Regions:
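N-terminal Sec/SRP start-transfer signal
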Residues: 1-13, 269-270
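Cytoplasmic juxtamembrane interface segments
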Residues: 3, 47, 53-56, 61-64, ...
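Hydrophobic alpha-helical segments of integral membrane proteins
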Residues: 5, 9, 89, 93-119, ...
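Hydrophobic alpha-helical transmembrane segments of membrane transport/permease proteins
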Residues: 16-103, 201-224
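Membrane-water interface segments at the C-terminal ends of transmembrane alpha-helices
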Residues: 26-29, 91, 177-210, 231, ...
Length: 370
């Protein structure tokens, strides 16, 4: 077991290096950048994400010069909108954002800093990236935890019921419903919920933005809880929609596999009722794979739904932070959040594998390759 864990931990290093390297290469060719953003702000130009994507220049390569740009000097020719600006000012911006160094040197410096969990400071927020992540992480964590809890709370009883009623009309209709729900993208369902229940076109029952109301700190403790769940209802439903199908069908198939085994027939032959067979014999074995998959289900909820759902509902978590950082070309925040997401994902995947062994000792990781 120890050697397996050691191999998995060592494999995390090249995996993280590969993720950071590919992302760094993509950034080199991405249009726009922090220098262009500052130039656009000075000139009053549109700095929105759409304009930067549809527009030209990045921070990482020379571009063709106009006559005015040639007069301004070679330094300003790299950036769209820099024509006529003092080349020394452009160079000072490059130095401020670290673009005065060649790309390999910047990448090596980033790896060295990340190895010490030093993600630098945000370009435009004047605060360290680590502090930003600490501030935003609880929001994303709470969404992931409650979404996973809600999924297990509904899917496990439903999956057991479907296994008991396998082939019945109940099984057929519920399968159709959860498969349709699985096919609907979470962000599209979130927009539908807003239209129906958040003042879009019909009812105005739930709030549209944030996790708490104004003046939340002044509420009594019981009203704080009510207000929190009032705000989180629509985001949770939107995130959990796709996970319901996966967990329900996993539970159903796990129970069906156990029900067909010899020990179940023996229990029935000994006179045990169906309820005793199901909950005293089948339940413990069938739930092994479901319970062991809890870390994986949580990390899936943490990653897959947080970006779009947090953006749609204006929830101030890591997903929204990453989205805004990409639009603003705030590269320290982009790479810092990417590193944290990747590291957490790798660690939780390892924990998920170890959970299988802890729940089912028959699994022997020492006998298999990583």
């Amino acid at each position: 077991m120890g050697s397996y864990i050691a191999r998995r931990i060592l494999l995390m290093i090249p995996t993280l290096l590969g993720i950071l390297f590919v992302s760094f290469i993509v950034v080199q060719f991405a249009p726009g950048g922090p220098v262009e953003r500052v130039i656009a702000q000075l000139s009053g130009a549109d700095t929105g994400g759409t304009s930067r994507i549809s527009g030209g220049g990045g921070d990482f390569g020379p571009r063709g010069q106009t006559a005015a740009g040639a007069a301004a000097g070679a330094a300003s020719s790299k950036y769209r909108g820099a024509q006529g600006l003092d080349p020394d000012f452009i160079k000072s911006l490059e130095k401020q954002f670290g673009f005065d160094k060649p790309a390999p040197e910047r990448f090596a410096l980033m790896l060295w800093n990340f190895s010490r969990f030093d993600f630098g400071k945000s370009y435009f927020r004047d605060v360290s990236v680590l502090q930003l992540i600490k501030e935003k992480l609880p929001v994303s964590m709470s969404l992931g935890i409650w979404m996973t809890f809600l999924t297990y709370l509904i899917s496990i009883p439903l999956g057991i019921r479907k296994a008991v009623k396998d082939g019945s009309k109940f099984d057929t209709w519920t399968s159709a419903v959860i498969i349709v729900g699985f096919a609907i993208p979470g962000f599209l369902f979130a927009i539908l919920l807003i239209i129906l229940f958040a003042g879009g076109s019909f009812l105005n029952i739930f709030p549209l933005r944030g996790l708490t109301s104004d003046g939340w700190s002044q509420f009594p403790w019981y009203w704080k809880i009510i207000d929190y769940f009032w705000h989180i209802t629509l985001p949770l439903i939107s995130m959990a929609l796709g996970a319901f199908a996966t967990m329900t069908l996993l539970t159903k198939n796990s129970f069906l596999d156990e029900i067909r085994k010899q020990y179940v027939m023996t229990a029935r032959a000994k006179g045990c009722s169906e309820r005793q067979v199901l909950y005293n014999h089948v339940f413990r074995n069938a739930m092994l794979i479901v319970i062991a998959g809890f870390p994986g289900a949580f990390i899936h909820a943490f990653f897959s739904g947080s970006l779009l759902i947090e953006t749609i509902f204006s929830l101030d978590g890591l997903g929204l932070l990453g989205f805004e950082s990409v639009l603003n070309r705030d590269y320290p925040v982009v790479f810092g959040t990417l590193f944290i997401f990747s590291l957490v994902g790798l660690v939780v995947n390892l924990i998920s594998d170890l959970a299988y062994m802890w729940i089912d000792p028959r699994i022997d990781f020492e006998a298999r390759e990583v």
